[in-house]
Design a protein with these regions (language model features):
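Eukaryotic scaffold repeat domains enriched in small/polar residues
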Residues: 31-450
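Sec-dependent bacterial lipoprotein signal peptides
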Residues: 1-28
Length: 450
């Protein structure tokens, strides 16, 4: 949990553990509204600000079951028009029928941990990247390693160890796949990038101005070799207790040093701040508006969670497309909110030092009427966009994901196994982390049946 003291933003040791417990999200832009782009701020103007959508724009509540019914019964609607040079896509219903809808295999093709991963448990696994060979690489922060697997999930090799020498990590952060199946791994502690070859051999180090650039999270490698990054919410002068949103640029990092900011500022996810001691503390607002990004080689998708709308921007932040779909926000029953509060207190009680902060965090936390429209986005290896249903950090992953094709047409919904958090999606397989009832995590691979 973040705290503010005087003019400085800092993490206490207690706060770091609680921030992790709060399921801190990567903070992205929120850039959806009901106006056409010609009527709002554009990405061409210097230091322009994309307005945060008003929560009043949410439509009447619905449920995943209603969407599932629509997947099989509503006719597919799809239109594309131009507005001031920006493509506006509107889609409704589903292109899939009950017979053609995609499904996930009932059992995993591979469940990875222990002996099958060279003795590494993979508990706490981070990002997963898919290689052109069909193999994949798993970031394992707890082991200070990257772990390579072949297309069938067989362990190949691991690279990295704890340390500051070349090829070592103090912290394994984001990893990204590069052309030629090299893998780029960020170490935010020592502010550098390590590049490993397809065989897992360490290739080179590159320094990057991470902290000077606002300690961004790496999202994707762009076609020119630069790295798209996103910034976190930061405390600012004048912020007060309650719900807060910041506006920040995205950042383009140049390997070897240097960075540039997008000219457009984007609102971050919503944060809940409360008075704690002589300053403020806080974290992402549970069930509050969340912003997410999904990168491509040419740009990135943004979604705010406030409306059934996402936007696509070029690498310079320039708005290119608006994608709107027919849908409504899921209602938030009082029972669900109360269960979250109870589960959050139970989690904090297991970490006694964080109990007081959690109690203060929850004391006046508002309960919205509905949940965000999305809880995450992933672009698969074929360019399709997958939108994750929202769940707060105490809730089980899985549920019904919505799929759009590369042209923005809504294809339908795919049910993901309970407890499975997707990290990467290939042409015919899904990769992610599954959490057992006892909290033990393992990496799983499921078939994607089309």
């Amino acid at each position: 949990m973040k705290r503010q003291t005087e003019k400085y933003s800092l993490y206490s040791s207690v706060g770091r553990s609680l921030l992790a417990a709060l399921g801190a999200v990567t903070l992205m832009t929120a850039c959806g509204n009901d106006s056409d782009p010609a009527e709002t701020a554009t990405a061409d103007s210097a230091d322009s600000v994309v307005p945060a959508p008003a929560t009043a724009a949410r439509t009447s509540p619905s449920s995943a079951s209603a969407d599932l019914e629509a997947r099989h019964s509503e006719p597919s609607g799809y239109s594309v028009r131009d507005s001031a040079g920006i493509q506006v896509i509107e889609t409704a219903g589903s292109a899939w029928t009950e017979e053609t809808a995609w499904t996930v295999g009932p059992e995993p093709l591979a469940s990875l941990g222990g002996e099958r991963t060279g003795g590494t448990s993979l508990h706490g696994a981070g990002r997963i990247v898919i290689l052109s060979s069909g193999g994949f690489v798993v970031a394992h922060p707890q082991g200070s390693q990257l772990v390579w697997f072949d297309p069938n999930g067989r362990f190949q090799h691991a690279a990295g160890h704890l340390g500051r020498s070349p090829g070592a990590f103090m912290i394994v952060g984001d990893i990204l796949a590069m052309p030629g199946d090299s893998v780029l791994a960020v170490d935010p502690e020592v502010r550098r990038v390590s590049v490993f070859g397809p065989d897992g051999e360490f290739a080179r180090l590159e320094s990057i101005d991470f902290r000077e650039a606002g300690s961004p999270s790496a999202v994707s490698v762009l076609s020119d070799g630069t790295i798209l990054g996103t910034r976190e919410f930061e405390f600012e002068e004048g912020m007060s207790a309650g719900l807060n949103r910041d506006s920040v640029p995205l950042v383009i990092l140049q390997p070897g040093g240097g960075f540039t900011n997008t000219r457009t500022l984007f609102p971050t996810s919503q944060h809940w701040l409360f008075e704690f001691g002589e300053g403020l503390a806080g974290g992402p607002a549970p069930f509050g508006a969340e912003s997410h990004v999904a990168g491509t080689v040419d740009g990135f998708w943004f979604g705010s969670g406030d409306t059934a709308e996402i936007t696509y921007h070029g690498a310079d932040g320039r708005l290119q497309k608006i994608l709107r779909w027919q849908g409504s926000a899921e209602p938030l029953p009082a029972e669900r909110f109360e269960k979250f509060e109870a589960d959050a207190m139970a989690a904090a009680a297991r970490n006694g030092a964080a109990l007081a902060e959690m109690r203060n965090f929850l004391r006046d936390l508002p309960s919205p009427d509905t949940t965000p429209y999305l809880g995450g986005m992933i672009v698969d290896s074929d360019g399709r966009l997958w939108i994750r249903p929202y769940h707060v950090w105490t809730e089980q992953a899985g549920g019904w994901w919505t799929v759009f094709d590369a042209n923005g047409r809504r294809m339908g919904m795919v049910e993901i196994p309970a407890g499975f958090e997707i990290r990467a999606i290939g042409s015919d397989r899904i990769y992610g982390v599954w959490t057992a009832e006892d909290g033990v995590e393992s990496v799983r691979v499921y078939a994607l049946n089309k």
